[in-house]
Amino acid sequence: MNKKIFTILFMLFSFLCIPANAVNIKENNGVYHIVLKSNRKTLKKLKCISVQDLMTNREIHKKSKAVLTVNGGFFDPVNKKSVSYVYTDRGLVEDPIFNENLYKSGIVRKNMDKILNRTEFRILECFDGYKTEISAHKNPVDFECQLVSAVQAGPLIDPQLQLDEEFFVVKDEEGNIIRESASVLHRAPRTIIGLEGDKYIHFLIFTDNHPVTLEEASKYCAKLGIDRAMALDGGGSTSFNYKKKIEVVSTPEKNQGRALKSFIMLNK
């Protein structure tokens, strides 16, 4: 009996017993689950980046000779400008305030505060080491920490789903949804990043073979024990590359993924 219990516990916990610099990837029914250990060694090599001209996940992954590359924040494919804040090497490199296309729509202008305060993934260097957090953009960084890198997207999906708060849905006076962005209420490929305390960083890649709503993605995160999670750009942007071993793209264009603006990358 004791041997049987030990075997079950070993199977449950072996997935998260990974070396300090390892990338653990499992695929099940069209969902890729990527786990990184959130320690100094990993976080010094993990960064959020943007490119001047749009590039596919494959292109930037190959050019950077990265270990892991995952698609990042929102962008405008017409003017190739970011709709999300991006910080790289302790500096702001993308600011959606300067994306003139955001100001062409009256309803978007009216809700700019919500758009600019969407959720972001942060890497911080603090007095006691490197940390990660998922937070609204306007939430200040703790005074003992410095922002090293960040990418904004949204919405927050765990512990609560913030569709209205981050302007992904608009409701009329009776509470009926009259506008939807990023197909948040419909099933689509998704890229999710989540944090399990200060121990692990989780990426969930829901492929074309397993599209989900954000509510379904939220429940999936809860089952995995993820404490806090947010959506990155999804749909046709969903993509990731791992070394030269794995490539996942959504609705391939010319046998490669969509050209994108920003990425989360783990370097060698």
State each model region's role.
Residues 2-20:
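Classical Sec-dependent N-terminal signal peptides that target proteins to the secretory pathway
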Residues 18-268:
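Gly/Ser/Thr/Pro-rich low-complexity, intrinsically disordered segments
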